[in-house]
């Protein structure tokens, strides 16, 4: 069971990376999403630390959810897949980017430079997949039946910090965060519908 669960997560991660970075090869006429309000949001390079929490969070959190409530995991998985597909569709239809600031010298500044460099071309801004997935984690943490209260508190807190850090690291603009809200809501509705339809088949495959 555990091996199949890890396999599902590995396939999802590969699917996400392939679509996320692959779609950048086809983007033309990039639109600037930066607005005057974004200049009022401070740049804190040290917040790259909570920003990077996203990567282990999306790897470990689903496994915790599955052990607690398989249905919540199934609806989480379906929603996540839809978020990825819809996000990439948005990136292809309306490519977005903006000019990032020059990080200062020092440890956190150098760390920030690595993140900027890892973003490839600095595209795929709106809607923020970082934020929409965090909204999904927050929602799942609240509704997951039987989840330990401390796990709820920790995961929601980390997810909120990640969303805020997308702004203070200048990886995203306010528009990116706001457009992630309707993306999440639509994906969530469709994800629940798919989970209701394929939950039994999914459990049979996993072997729960």
Regions found by a protein language model. Give the residues of each.
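Alpha-helical transmembrane segments of integral membrane proteins
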Residues: 4-12, 74-82, 151-155, 175, ...
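Membrane-embedded alpha-helical segments of multi-pass membrane proteins
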Residues: 14, 53-57, 132-133, 178, ...
């Amino acid at each position: 069971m555990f091996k199949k669960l890890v396999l599902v997560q590995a396939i999802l991660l590969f699917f996400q990376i392939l679509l996320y970075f692959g779609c950048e090869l086809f983007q033309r006429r990039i639109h600037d999403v930066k607005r005057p309000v974004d200049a009022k949001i401070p740049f804190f390079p040290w917040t790259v630390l909570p920003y990077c929490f996203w990567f282990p969070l999306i790897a470990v959190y689903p496994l915790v959810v599955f052990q607690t409530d398989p249905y919540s995991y199934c609806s989480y998985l379906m929603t996540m897949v839809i978020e990825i597909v819809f996000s990439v569709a948005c990136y292809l239809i309306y490519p977005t980017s903006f000019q990032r600031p020059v990080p200062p010298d020092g440890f956190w500044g150098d760390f920030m430079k690595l993140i900027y460099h890892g973003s490839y071309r600095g595209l795929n801004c709106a809607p923020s997949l970082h934020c929409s997935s965090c909204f999904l984690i927050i929602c799942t943490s609240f509704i997951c039946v039987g989840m330990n209260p401390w796990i709820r508190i920790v995961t929601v807190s980390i997810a909120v910090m990640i969303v805020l850090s997308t702004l203070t690291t200048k990886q995203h603009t306010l528009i990116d965060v706001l457009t992630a809200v309707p993306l999440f809501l639509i994906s969530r509705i469709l994800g629940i519908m798919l989970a209701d339809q394929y939950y039994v088949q999914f459990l049979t495959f996993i072997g729960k």
